[in-house]
Amino acid sequence: MTQNHPLKWFSVVVVIVWCVLFLRAENTEKSIVRALFLEQTDTGWSAGLFYQFPEASADASETDAQIRFALASGQTPQAALTQTEEKLPRKASYRLCDYLVLGQESDFDTLQTCESLFLEHPYGRLASRVFCADFSGTALETQNEEDEYLPESLLDLLKSDKTAPHLYENRNGVLLPVLELNDGELSDREERLLLTETGQVTLTADQTEAALFLSGAKHTCQFQSETNPVELTSLAQSVELEGEDFHLVLTCRVPPDGRRPTDEEIARWETLCTETVRLCWENGSDLLRLSSVQALRDGTNTLTTKNACPEVRASVKMLDL
C-alpha cells in the first residue's frame, strides 16, 4: 500500500502536466476564427475568415489579439474555406465563430447553403448571428491592406448588434442588418433586408423598428414624428382572432425620460405596425405567427403566406407607470 502511494502521486502529476500542455496547445497554437464571410460569385464562392493568433483563448469570448482577415475562392463553400484556411498561420478553430456575414449578392438559398454546411462540417454554429454586407470580399480585402485594424472594427460592429437573427431562425425568413463600407469606414444601415424563401425586400428605418419590435427582438422602439422621435417600451403583446381577422394589441409605456405620444402619433404607429405585418407577409414572412393563432382556434393550420394577407388591425394601449 505504501509502495503504491508515490506511484499514485506521480500519475496525478503526469495527468496534470498533460492537461496543461493540451490546453496550452488548444488555446495558443490555433488560429481562432471569430467571424465568417461567405459570398457567391460568378465563378463559385469566396470565403473570408476573421481570426486571431496566437494570443487568443479558446475558452473566452473576449480576446486581446488583433483581428486579421484572410480571403480565398473555390468552386464550393467548403473548397473556398479550405483555401482560406491554408492562408492562416495555424489550424483554424471555429469554437468562437459567433458571426456569419453574407456577401452582397446573397439570397435565401445562400442562407440554407450555410445551414447545411454548418450541419455537415465544423465551420460554424447554427447559433451564429447573421449579417449581410453591401460590399464584396475583394473590396474588404483591398481596404484591409490600407487599414489593418478594419477587421477589428468589423468584429466590434458585429458584437454590438444584439438583434441580428441566428442562422437557425431562417425558416420564417430573417431580417438582416446591412453593413456598409464607405471611404474606409464601416457602419450598419438603419434599414434592414428581409430574406425569405419567396424573395427579399428592404424595409425602411421605421418598418425595421416596427418589425424588430413586433418580433420581440427589441423591447424598446423609436420611430420618427414631425417633431421629436417617439420612444415606446413594450409591456405586453397579444394577437386575437376575430372571425377571419386579427387584432394586434400592444401594451406600452413611455420611458421615464421620454414624452407621451399624441393620439395622432399613436395612430401613425398603429398604421405602421399593420403595414409592416402586411409587407412581411406578402414577402413570405409571418411576422406575428398568425397561422399559429388560427391553428390554436381551429385545430388546423390552413393559413400560410401563400394566401392573401388577412385583415390585421392594431391597437396601442398606453400605461402610466
Residue ranges and their predicted role:
Residues T2-L321:
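Membrane-proximal alpha-helical signals and transmembrane carboxylates
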